[in-house]
């Protein structure tokens, strides 16, 4: 029977066995370490010399629970970020016609009629500045909307590969998008 265990240790199955060592809070990242064969030796001794039964006798929850939890958290965060981004961007697009119309009408009304020639240039300058500021905000927000998506995807991929996805990054994302939403609205 020991030769059976030795043969399993040398196969790819033994290298694939992992155990998740996580914490109850999300402040520290979960780590995935290789399983010790001693943890499963009592289960392996009861198995006949049939290699296909080895993986079915080892509980799958030990090896994949951390990965499933990580994926659920990751997808929930990505969904939340995309939803907040989309809502802020589309709210701005819905307000765009009214912003442009009000700016144009203000510029037209206060610079041409109901004013003197000296006041004409002052009101025209203020209206033009307001119009340019709103156009600049729209341009920057649309650029940020597409640019931030790429940066977030790249950063999440990097952290996912390195296994460093943790609550501080989530808090940073929430703070960033709250600030963006406040500025846009």
UniProtKB/Swiss-Prot annotation:
**Stretches that traverse the bilayer:** 70-90, 92-112, 119-139
Alphabetically sorted, this entry's keywords are: Membrane, Transmembrane, Transmembrane helix
Q: How does it sit in the membrane?
A: Multi-pass membrane protein
Name by which UniProt lists this protein: Putative uncharacterized membrane protein YOR331C
Residue intervals on the Extracellular side: 91, 140-185
Give the subcellular location: Membrane
What's in the misc comment field? Almost completely overlaps VMA4.
Query: Record's superkingdom?
Result: Eukaryota
Ranges facing Cytoplasmic side: 1-69, 113-118
One annotated Gene Ontology cellular component of this protein: membrane
